[in-house]
C-alpha cells in the first residue's frame, strides 16, 4: 500500500479545508440481498427442488472517491492520504424461481420479480483518486431459495459481488537452511504458507504463465515443481548433474537449466528432459527466440545452437565476464564485466552477435545483475544505487541503502522485494522513491526470490 505522506501542517490545513476524517469506515466488496417472491394463487414451489436464477443491471451505479487520512507511523504527525472508493445507486435484479407447479403438482413454469438492491458502501481504499472498479465485473453468487415461514413469503437470497477480490500475486523465497519455500501474498504482504521440501533449495523461478514454480536442488541433482494454485509440490525432476540456474522465455514451452557443463531443455508441461546440450561455463542466458544459448567462460561469450550444440560464434573480452542476462522481447544480451575494481556493462546485439556498446560503471562498485519479469537491473552494493538496464545502457532509478541476498519487483513495478538472509525477513520498497514500505518477518532465512 503506497503512502502519500503529509506534514502535520499540511494535515491540519487539509482538515480545515476539506474536513478530512480518518479512514475508519469498513470496506466490503459484497452486498447481500433478499428478494421476496409472491406466488400466484393456486401455485406452489417446492423449496427442496427449486432453482433460482438472477440477471441484473447496474447502469445506475456510480462511483465516488472520498479523501481520508491514515496513520503512517507512531507519531501524531505521521499521517497520509487515501481515498475511500464508494459505490452508490441501485442494482436492479430480475429474480426467477422454477419449477412452479399447480396445486396438483402439474406444470413446469417459473415466476419472476424485479428487486432493487440499494447500494451505498465503501468497496475498498486506494492510493489513487480515480481508482474506480469496472461495474461490468459485478457477479451474483450464493443463490438460495428460502421457504416461507411465519407469514413471510418465499424468497431468494444471494450475494452481489460488486468488486471481485484481486487475484493473488505470490512471492516465493527459497530458504536453504530450512529446506522450505515461503509464499508471500504481495497484495497483503503476509506469509500465506511455508512449503516443505525434501532437499535444500537454491535457485527458484516461476514459469511465464504462472502455472508452476521450479525449485533447484544442486546438491541433489533434483528440481522440485510447485503448483502455483495449490501451493503444493506436484512433481520432481531428476537430473544427472547439479542444476545451478534456470531460465524461461515467455510464450515458449521449455525451461532451460544450466549445470555448468550442459544446458538441459525441459518441457514445462511434460516435466521431462527433451534434450541436453554439452557446454561449459559459469553463466548462461537464452536468446528470446529460444534457438541459442549465450555462455560465459572467463573472458569469452559463446553463442551455442540449442538444437545441434554447435558453437556458432565467440566474442572475446579483456576482463572477466561474470554475468549475462537477456530480456524479452528485445534481442540484446547484457554482460557484466568485472576485474579488480573495474566494472563494465557490455551490450550485445543478438541479431548480429556484435558488441553494440560498452559502458564504464562506478570504480570499486560491487555490482550484481538480475532480471525481474522482462526487465534487467544492476545493483551496486557499494553505493546502494539501483540501475535499470536497456539497449542504451544502465541508468540509476533509485537508491536502496541496505544490501540484500536477492531482489524481485512486483509485476506492476510498484514495489521491490529484497530478501535479508541473516535478518530472516524481506524488505519491501516503494518504487516511487525507494523508501521502505514494510518489513515481512519470515522466521527463516530467505535466499533467492521470485514474483
From Swiss-Prot:
This is Protein YwhK. InterPro entries: Host-pathogen_enzymatic-act, N2O_reductase_N, WD40/YVTN_repeat-like_dom_sf. Interacts with PcrA. The interaction is not essential for cell viability or repair of UV-induced lesions. It comes from the Bacteria. SUPFAM superfamilies: Nitrous oxide reductase, N-terminal domain. Disruption phenotype: Non-essential, it can be disrupted. No PcrA-related phenotype. It comes from Bacillus subtilis (strain 168).
Amino acid at each position: 500500500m503506497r503512502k502519500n505522506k503529509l506534514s502535520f501542517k499540511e494535515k491540519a490545513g487539509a482538515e480545515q479545508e476539506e474536513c478530512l476524517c480518518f479512514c475508519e469506515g469498513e470496506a466490503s466488496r459484497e452486498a447481500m440481498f433478499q428478494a421476496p417472491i409472491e406466488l400466484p394463487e393456486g401455485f406452489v414451489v417446492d423449496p427442496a427442488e427449486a432453482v433460482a436464477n438472477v440477471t441484473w443491471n447496474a447502469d445506475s451505479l456510480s462511483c465516488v472517491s472520498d479523501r481520508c487520512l491514515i496513520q503512517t507511523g507512531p507519531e501524531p504527525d505521521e499521517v497520509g492520504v487515501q481515498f475511500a472508493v464508494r459505490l452508490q445507486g441501485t442494482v436492479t435484479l430480475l429474480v426467477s424461481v422454477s419449477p412452479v407447479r399447480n396445486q396438483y403438482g402439474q406444470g413446469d413454469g417459473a415466476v419472476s420479480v424485479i428487486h432493487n438492491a440499494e447500494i451505498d458502501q465503501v468497496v475498498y481504499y486506494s492510493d489513487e483518486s480515480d481508482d474506480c472498479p469496472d461495474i461490468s465485473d459485478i457477479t451474483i453468487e450464493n443463490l438460495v431459495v428460502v421457504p416461507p415461514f411465519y407469514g413471510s413469503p418465499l424468497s431468494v437470497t444471494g450475494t452481489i459481488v460488486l468488486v471481485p477480490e484481486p487475484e493473488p500475486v505470490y512471492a516465493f523465497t527459497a530458504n536453504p537452511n530450512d529446506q522450505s519455500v515461503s509464499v508471500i501474498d504481495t497484495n497483503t504482504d503476509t506469509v500465506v504458507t511455508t512449503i516443505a521440501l525434501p532437499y535444500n533449495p537454491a535457485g527458484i523461478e516461476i514459469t511465464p504463465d504462472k502455472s508452476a514454480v521450479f525449485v533447484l536442488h544442486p546438491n541433489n541433482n533434483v528440481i522440485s515443481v510447485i503448483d502455483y494454485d495449490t501451493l503444493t509440490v506436484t512433481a520432481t525432476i531428476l537430473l544427472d548433474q547439479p542444476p545451478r540456474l534456470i531460465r524461461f522465455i515467455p510464450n515458449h514451452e521449455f525451461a532451460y537449466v544450466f549445470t555448468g557443463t550442459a544446458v538441459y531443455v525441459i518441457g514445462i508441461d511434460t516435466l521431462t528432459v527433451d534434450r541436453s546440450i554439452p557446454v561449459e561455463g559459469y553463466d548462461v542466458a537464452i536468446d528470446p527466440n529460444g534457438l541459442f544459448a549465450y555462455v560465459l567462460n572467463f573472458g569469452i561469450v559463446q553463442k551455442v545452437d540449442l538444437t545441434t550444440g554447435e558453437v556458432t560464434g565467440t566474442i572475446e573480452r579483456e576482463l572477466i565476464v561474470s554475468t549475462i542476462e537477456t530480456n524479452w522481447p528485445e534481442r540484446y544480451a547484457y554482460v557484466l564485466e568485472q576485474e579488480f575494481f573495474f566494472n563494465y556493462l557490455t551490450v550485445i546485439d543478438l541479431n548480429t552477435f556484435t558488441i553494440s556498446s560498452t559502458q564504464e560503471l562506478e570504480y570499486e562498485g560491487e555490482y550484481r545483475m538480475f532480471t525481474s519479469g522482462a526487465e534487467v537491473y544492476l545493483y551496486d552494493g557499494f553505493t546502494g544505487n539501483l540501475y535499470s538496464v536497456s539497449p542504451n545502457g544502465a541508468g540509476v532509478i533509485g537508491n536502496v541503502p541496505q544490501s540484500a541476498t536477492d531482489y524481485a519487483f512486483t509485476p506492476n513495478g510498484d514495489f521491490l522485494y529484497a530478501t535479508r538472509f541473516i535478518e530472516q525477513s524481506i524488505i519491501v520498497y516503494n518504487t516511487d522513491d525507494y523508501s521502505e514500505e514494510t518489513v515481512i518477518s519470515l522466521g527463516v532465512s530467505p535466499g533467492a526470490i521470485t514474483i
